[in-house]
Structure formats: structure tokens, C-alpha cells
Amino acid sequence: MGLKEDRWITDMALPHNMIEPFCENQVGKNVVSYGLSSYGYDIRVSNEFKIFTNINATVVDPKNFDEANVVDFIGDICIVPPNSFALARTVEYFRIPRDVLAICLGKSTYARCGIIVNVTPFEPEFEGHITIEISNTTPLPAKIYANEGIAQVLFLQGDADCEVSYKDKKGKYQKQEGITLPRILK
């Protein structure tokens, strides 16, 4: 299983629509950088956010998630409260090939400010926007800039196609659009 380089990412993104929209260059002046890098792709966070709140004093339960736990926000700058959490989504829509697994890591620009980004792996044949988990670990409010970089995706190509892909098993987040809250298959 090898890490894929910029030429491969471009070859998969443009003719095969693996990443839409696709930025062929790294954009980094006066913004948190995004676009193609040497061995990855820096994804952007959209302007849609769900910010966790304790106003309704409910319990966060992944098996029975209460939407009262979050407040919807749309804007160019999202302020994540101290020691709090927000969900967002990528600007980019992904179509992962059957022989590829993608792993996402937070950007150092945000990490150095105490903002931790978590995204689970993009499984083979996953398709959709990526829901991004953003944690503000600081005792201060933190700014997240919409339409700028938030994390980097690394693409790992297997030696052969997997037996069962995310699409084959009808993954619960397949073809998700917007920010998708926790789901449990029943």
C-alpha cells in the first residue's frame, strides 16, 4: 500500500472526479492553505457549521443523538466556544476509488492554536462530502475560517481491490451532503 503523489491525485481528480471542486495548486497567501500538495490534498471547510451547546442540557448519545445539542451557523467565520466542539463539512465532494483508502490529518496552523480536527478514514468507494469534527481545546474562543484549509487528505492505494467496499456494504454515510449527524443502522 503506497502513498500517492500529486500527479496521481491530479490524474484521479480531474478525469475521474475523485475531488470536486479540485484546486490544482496550493493556495496559501493570506489564507489557511488549501489545494494540491506534494503527497496530499488540503481540503477546505465550508461555511456551514453545527456548534455544540449546553443550552438544552441534554446528553450527547451517539446511538440516539438529539439535534438540540447543536446550533446551526452559516458564515465566513465560525467562533467555536472555549473547550467546545463543532461539526462542519468540506467544500469538496469525494469519490474514492475501490483500491484506495484516504486518511485525513489536521493542519498545523490550527493545531498550533489548540484546534484539533478529526475525520475518520474515507473508505474504498465512499462518496460524499466529508463531515469534519473540530475541537477547541483552549480556554479561549477560536476562529475557523470558512472556504479555507482545515485538514490534509493522504491517499493510500492498496495492492488489489478490496473484497467489500463502503458502497458494497451500503455504508450509512454514503453520498452524504451537508453536515451529517451520527447515525446508527437499525
Curated annotation (Swiss-Prot):
DCTP binds at residues 107-112, 152, 166, 175-176. GO terms for molecular function: dCTP deaminase activity; nucleotide binding. The active site is at residue 133. Keywords: Hydrolase, Nucleotide metabolism, Nucleotide-binding. GO terms for biological process: dUMP biosynthetic process; dUTP biosynthetic process; nucleobase-containing small molecule interconversion. The keyword ATP-binding does not apply. Its EC number is 3.5.4.13. Catalyzes the deamination of dCTP to dUTP. Pathway: Pyrimidine metabolism; dUMP biosynthesis; dUMP from dCTP (dUTP route): step 1/2. Homotrimer. It catalyses: dCTP + H2O + H(+) = dUTP + NH4(+). This is dCTP deaminase. HAMAP family: dCTP_deaminase (MF_00146). Gene3D superfamilies: 2.70.40.10. Belongs to the dCTP deaminase family. InterPro entries: dCTP_deaminase, dUTPase-like_sf, dUTPase_trimeric. Disulfide bonds: none annotated. CDD domains: trimeric_dUTPase. It comes from Wolinella succinogenes (strain ATCC 29543 / DSM 1740 / CCUG 13145 / JCM 31913 / LMG 7466 / NCTC 11488 / FDC 602W) (Vibrio succinogenes).
